[in-house]
Every structure is written in structure tokens, then in C-alpha cells.
Amino acid sequence: MFQKLFKIISILVIFSTNALADGEATYKSICMACHENGVSGAPKFRSIRDWAPIIKEGKVHVIAEAYNGIRKMPAQGGRPDLKLEDFSEALIYMANASGAKWEKPSEQEYIKIKNKLAKLNSKKETQ
């Protein structure tokens, strides 16, 4: 029983560590260009002041709005090939470095994010 529990916990730790590593890699290869120094008003990496109001909006809302494109940031960070999951991990990596305590979205949260994205996209089409 104890060994089985230990294996399950070990697997969870490995997956959460991998998600963090993936978020960091995506940040460094895509997001860092703007977020490292706050280019065009982008919230600066590790800036609690910049990120606090964003974090208050909630993980689901922020991921959907940002993935859709917000302020001067283009949709998907300007990378049409960037998957929602990879984008989410990078955003969570940045938010957590700036005071959030967010985890990778659950399946239910991804459903909410995708529903919000569908609404945002339908608004774009009618404008």
C-alpha cells in the first residue's frame, strides 16, 4: 500500500516538474523577448507589481484572454503554431515567478478556457 502511494506521488511530482520545465522553455524561446523587459507594456517577468492585478483576474480568464491576444500582444504570442497547453504552461510559469501559486489547468479548467476562447472568437467575427 505504502509503495503504491509512493509511486503515485512520484509520478505526480515528475509530471508537475516537467510542466514547469516546459513552461520555462516556452517562456525562454517565445515570451522572454517581450516579458523580460516589459516591451510595449508587457508585464515584466518576476514583477509582482505588474502581475498582481493580472493574477487577481484568475487563471482561466487570463489564459483565455492572453491566448486570444490582449493589448499589444498578438494571439498565441504571435506564434500560430503554439498550442494552448504550451501557452498555458508558459503563462503559469511567468505568473508563478511573479507571486501566483497556479497549477497546470485541470481538464475542467481547460474546458472553461476553450469555451471562453470560442466566445471571444465569435465576438471577433461579428465585429
Predicted features, each with a name:
Residues 2-14:
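Sec-dependent signal peptide recognition
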Residues 16-18:
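N-terminal signal peptide c-region/cleavage motif recognized by signal peptidases
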Residues 20-24:
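Boundary of Sec targeting at the N-terminus
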Residues 25, 60, 64, 88-92:
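Solvent-exposed, polar/charged alpha-helical surfaces in well-ordered, non-transmembrane soluble domains
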Residues 27-37, 90, 94:
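The canonical Cys-X-X-Cys-His
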Residues 33-64, 74-77:
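Gly/Gly-Pro-rich "capping" loops immediately C-terminal to redox-active cysteine motifs
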Residues 70:
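Short, surface-exposed glycine/acidic/tryptophan-bearing loops
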Residues 77-127:
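Flexible coil segments in periplasmic/lumen-exposed cytochrome c-class electron-transfer proteins
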